[in-house]
């Protein structure tokens, strides 16, 4: 039995133990941390699966107990989430059968999507049914995530051989080894920490979500200012140590969006605190940047902080010439003698253009998950959603999440509002609804009712 499976078994036993002891807060806290940080399940012969499948199975068992004990509490938003996501899933199934290239292996795609939906639904149900103080629960979850990621991140940064061995053993499996292979072959050390993930990009998304959550606490809980400030700086520090472009750009975009909302809502008394958060952000950049220079990462600081994190440059790699037809024959016929322009256009094409072209050919319901013409599927939740489910599926998601955002804005639920917007921002550069680390935070967002701390 591998160390991965031993860790997973012990964690699952802890979740079940505290659940049986009716210490639901600890059970849900461990569950939330596990969705983010738990290693992959190693089966043998190089085969591994995401441990979120096992965690979701445990959630289903706990849900059944809730149902049979008649303690389950469900509100409208949770039902709407479950219904909307499953309707979208049905659309993708139809799209695959009608327009796609169906294979037996595609069942895995749909099982993964459904377990994600069930996991988000289950965690939200636990928060409501046991009347947990969700803000206290999530602060504890964030502390656990930060501690584990700094521990592993520091090993990666300062002990390459051990860090690589731990990362490959715990978090790398088939199809997910490209980032660490690139580091191994081209650099020979970790210049970007991976934390408890297979890629620093995922750590960057997690960093941005955590600091967005803590921002609200900084502005509304003066009694715990020092504690919240430490959590904010620590959360941002993880994204910077990962040289995450999403974190570097996103932290300022989120700050601007929050500032605009505060002005629109005339929350003038909070604005000084919001500028205080900006000062903490700049301080963290200076602190982490200085430390990175001191350990010989100066060239990477210059590149990621000032060049690669240019918003226009960051978007071009994915979205350049997205809406233009990628059949260059037409351009050549209409512009005889302009071969150079044709070649240059090909060079600056984003990696999602072919994916978007498939959507344009099947705009109503898409083609389902998987490739039909060797197009790249990934790196954007929005384009992937259009590819997989077409305009219908995109509309379902837009109506649900858009309605939720508007509702939170009107009801001044800023923590949920900006956490949803941060998840949406992450969707610009990755498929956020396929990563288990998003599950606990999305569950927080669909818990609309005010909850009280359980006894």
Give the role of each language-model region.
Residues 210, 254-256, 417-455:
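Transmembrane alpha-helices of multi-pass inner-membrane enzymes
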Residues 151, 157-161, 262-333, 357-358:
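A membrane-periplasm/extracellular boundary helix in multi-pass inner-membrane enzymes
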Residues 38-47, 303, 315-392:
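Long extracytoplasmic/lumenal interhelical loops at the membrane interface
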Residues 139-167, 188-189, 195-243, 247-264:
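Alpha-helical transmembrane segments of multi-pass inner-membrane proteins
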Residues 28-43, 55-118, 422-425:
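N-terminal hydrophobic segments of proteins, predominantly signal-anchor/transmembrane helices
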Residues 218-228, 252-264, 388-424:
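Hydrophobic transmembrane alpha-helices and their immediate junctions
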Residues 273-274, 281, 407-413, 443-455:
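A juxtamembrane structural motif centered on a specific transmembrane helix
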Residues 14-17, 60-71, 96-159:
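Transmembrane alpha-helical segments and their membrane-water interfaces
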């Amino acid at each position: 039995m591998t160390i991965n499976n031993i860790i997973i078994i012990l964690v699952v036993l802890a979740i079940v133990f505290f659940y049986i002891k009716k210490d639901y807060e600890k059970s849900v806290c461990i569950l939330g941390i596990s969705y983010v940080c738990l290693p992959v399940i190693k089966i043998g012969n190089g085969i591994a699966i995401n441990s979120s499948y096992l965690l979701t199975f445990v959630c289903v068992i706990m849900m059944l107990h809730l149902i049979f004990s008649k303690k389950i509490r469900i509100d409208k938003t949770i039902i709407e989430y479950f219904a909307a996501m499953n309707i979208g899933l049905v659309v993708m199934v139809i799209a695959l059968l009608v327009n796609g290239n169906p294979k037996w292996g595609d069942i895995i795609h749909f099982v993964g999507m459904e377990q994600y939906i069930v996991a988000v639904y289950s965690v939200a149900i636990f928060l409501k049914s046991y009347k947990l103080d969700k803000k206290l629960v999530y602060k504890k979850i964030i502390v656990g995530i930060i501690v584990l990621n700094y521990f592993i991140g520091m090993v990666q940064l300062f002990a390459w051989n051990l860090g690589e061995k731990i990362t490959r053993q715990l978090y790398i499996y088939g199809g997910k080894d490209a980032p660490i292979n690139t580091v191994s072959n081209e650099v020979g050390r970790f210049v970007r920490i991976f934390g408890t993930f297979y890629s620093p990009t995922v750590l960057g998304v997690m960093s941005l979500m955590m600091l967005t959550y803590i921002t609200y606490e900084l502005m509304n809980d003066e009694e715990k200012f020092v504690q919240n400030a430490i959590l904010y700086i620590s959360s941002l520090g993880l994204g910077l140590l990962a040289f995450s472009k999403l974190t570097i750009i996103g932290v300022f975009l989120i700050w601007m969006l929050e500032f605009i909302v505060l002005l629109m809502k005339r929350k003038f008394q909070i604005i000084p605190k919001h500028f205080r958060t900006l000062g903490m952000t700049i301080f963290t950049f200076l602190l982490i940047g200085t430390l990175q220079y001191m350990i010989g990462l100066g060239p990477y600081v210059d590149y990621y902080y000032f060049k690669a994190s240019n918003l226009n440059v960051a978007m071009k790699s994915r979205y350049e010439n997205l809406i233009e037809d990628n059949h260059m024959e037409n351009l050549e016929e209409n512009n005889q003698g302009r071969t150079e322009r044709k070649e240059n256009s090909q060079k600056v094409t984003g990696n999602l253009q072919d994916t978007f072209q498939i959507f344009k050919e099947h705009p109503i319901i898409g083609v389902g998950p998987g490739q039909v013409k060797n197009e790249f599927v990934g790196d954007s939740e929005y384009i992937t959603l259009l590819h997989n489910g077409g305009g219908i599926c995109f509309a379902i998601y837009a109506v649900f999440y858009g309605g939720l955002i508007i509702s939170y804005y009107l009801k001044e639920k800023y923590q949920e509002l900006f956490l949803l917007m941060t998840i949406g921002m992450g969707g610009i550069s990755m498929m956020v609804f396929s990563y288990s680390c998003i599950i606990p935070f999305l569950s927080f967002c669909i818990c609309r009712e005010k909850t009280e701390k359980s006894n």
